[in-house]
From Swiss-Prot:
Disulfide bond positions: none
Family: Belongs to the Nudix hydrolase family. RppH subfamily.
Record-listed E.C. numbers: 3.6.1.-
Top-level EC class as recorded in UniProt: hydrolase
Gene that encodes it: rppH
Protein name as it appears in the record: RNA pyrophosphohydrolase
Species, as recorded: Sphingopyxis alaskensis (strain DSM 13593 / LMG 18877 / RB2256)
Length: 158
């Protein structure tokens, strides 16, 4: 039996992408039948810095390239979440207990037609812009505290 508390956190970068109207991008996860929505995020590759990873993940998940965004802020600290026990063996080969995430607030300077979630690394089956107050109820319960922290930190800048 694996002691989950001894597993490391997976290094990750995430993007709170805000449009010019102050609404935030969320995508509905493709790998589950539940109403699981989230902001773009993903692992940091070996030797990659968090900012480059965030821009890469944004492109892989939304088709938005770095020239269409302005970086407004970087989170003051890393955010952490733990997976529920029943998911630890199913995610990332059971090597991680959850994620430690560097987050970036980015302003989307493009048009909605620039967004294409049907990418080679498709993660989302649907997407939409939402008000900050809507985000928490869309997110899976084990990530809600993390998202509350992001909204508190980035909300005034959105």
């Amino acid at each position: 039996m694996i002691d989950h508390d001894k597993l490391p956190y997976r290094p990750c970068a995430g993007v709170m992408l805000a449009n010019r109207d102050g609404r935030v991008f969320v995508g509905q996860r493709l790998d589950t039948s539940s109403e699981a929505w989230q902001m773009p995020q993903g692992g940091i590759d070996e030797g990659e810095d968090a900012e480059k990873a965030a821009i890469r993940e944004l492109g892989e998940e939304t088709g938005i390239h770095g020239g269409l965004v302005d970086i407004i802020a970087r989170s003051r600290e890393e955010y952490f979440y733990d997976l529920p026990d029943h998911l630890i063996g199913k995610m990332w080969g059971g090597k991680y207990r959850g994620q430690r995430q560097h987050w970036f607030l980015m302003r989307f300077m493009g048009e909605d037609s620039d967004i294409d979630i049907h990418t080679r690394h498709q993660e989302f089956r649907a997407w939409r812009w939402v008000d900050l107050g809507e985000i928490e109820k869309l997110i899976v319960p084990f990530k809600r505290a993390l998202y509350r922290g992001l909204i508190e930190e980035f909300g005034p800048l959105v």
